[in-house]
Structure formats: C-alpha cells, structure tokens
Amino acid sequence: MAVSPMRASVYYVTVAGLGGEPDYEQRFTATAKDLDKVFKASSGAHVYTLTGNQATRARLTETMTAVAREAKAEDDLVLTLIGHGSFDGVEYKFNLVGPDVSAAELAAMCDKVPARRQLVVNTTSASGGSVAALERPGRGVIAATKTGTEKNATVFARYWVEALQDPTADVDKSESISAMEAFQYADRKTAGFYESQKRLATEHAVFEDTGHGEAVRAGAAQGREGALLSSLTVVRIGVSQAAMNDPAKRDLLAKKEELEQKIDALKYQKAAMDPGDYKKQLTEALLQLATVQGELEK
C-alpha cells in the first residue's frame, strides 16, 4: 500500500552513469530523462538529473550537498542510479564520467541529507554488492541484482520507469505507486523479458528496508521486511496527483495518506494484536478512508 505521510517536498536525484558504448550511453540517458519527466509532474518536488558529461563524482557531490542543505527531516529523498556498476568482492562502485563513486561514498552523501525517509534505487549491474554499504534504518535500498557477481548489463531500470507510468502498478488502487509496488512490477516485467527472449535471467532484483540484514526478493506477509517500501510513495497518479496541485484539497490528501498509513501499520501488527481489536480498528480506518476519498473525488 502506498502510504507515505504528507511531505513538504520530495527530492529526486537521478544519475545516468558512464555508458562506455554509444548504445548504452543513449539508453541510460533516455531512461534518466524519462524519470525526470515523471518526477517533474509531481507538485512540490525538487528534481535533479545528471546525464552525459554532468554525470561526474564532483557534480553528484555538489548536487547531494545542495539537497542536504535544503531538505528537511519531513522531506523524502529518492536517489536513482542508472548505468554500469562493478564489484570486486569487497567494494561496489558506480561507473561515472571520470572517477567512479563507491557505495560507501554514496551512503555518506545520503547520510548528510536530513530527510528521515530515503530510497536508493540502484539499477546497475553488480548493484547487489552495494546494499550492505547503503542500508540503514529509514532508508530503503533496491538493487537490480541479488549479488555483486551478477555483472551483466541490466534491464530492470526500463521496467522501473514503466512502473511509475503504468496505472496497473497501483495494485491497491490508492492512486499512488509505492516503492514496493514499483519493485514488484519491475521485477515481474524483468523476469518476463528473459522468458520472452528464451534467455537465462542474469539479474534478480532484491531490496532491504529494515536497516540491517540481508537483502530479500520478497517482503514478509507480516513482518518488517517490505514495510518501509510499502509505505513510501514514489509517485502519485489520478485524483491524488490532482489533489497535490490543488491547495484546497491538500489537507484531505494528507488525511487520506495518514489513514492509509494506519491501515498499513495495522497489517504489519496483526499477528501481535487481539483479533477483535484489530477488526475494530481496521473497520474504523476503512470507513474514514472511504469518506475522505469521496471528498477528494468531488
């Protein structure tokens, strides 16, 4: 369920790294530009996109420093890496124009951003090798490969962008697409790509959003894995997107997202709750949500 609390702003930083070959260069740049358009459609968003000769470690450092200076604790950060990565068994590096940047350096940049809720989407080859360095409480990490040894070029980024543009990715019909919904959509489409090509899959996407532990392929039905990604809205669509652009409806949208967050929390707490109390709280929240949704649609 896509249920983030109301935020003053979202900071989207997208980087298309070094392609090495013209076809990769074109693909990475096009993917980054597609994301740029999607993110700029969000009201209250701050969008930074680095491609071509701008995709350097120095420029990325400058951008993240600016975000760290401007962002507040209640804001969200979404960092997306597109391109090639490498892993030598110890250290992951994201390939950029000029010096590469390591996962540890990327984590240090993100650590300086005060936004309490962060998402890093690493769509590169060998990206699984970056998870351990990037993970921390309050930060969800998605990687296109399950380990640093899956080193072939990936297609996950293509379907991640598609997920943020396809209303069918909004599985719970909340008119917002969560990081978990986008992950599941892109993972499914990636698997379908290899099946259609009759090729052995060389990438298996994973995520980690508890702040510690191993990356996983799927969240627990009732547990911590997947809770943050499910609650973190990447983009809004439909009525929710329109409401963000309508000052008169922003308070209603805030209430809607607050109720959705409560419902999501109840789902993860169900196993530890009295069944009667769970049913009562869930019913009340669902009725309130229906009322608010009706007001938004007027």
For each predicted feature, which ranges?
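Cysteine endopeptidase catalytic domains of the caspase/legumain-like
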Residues: S4-K298
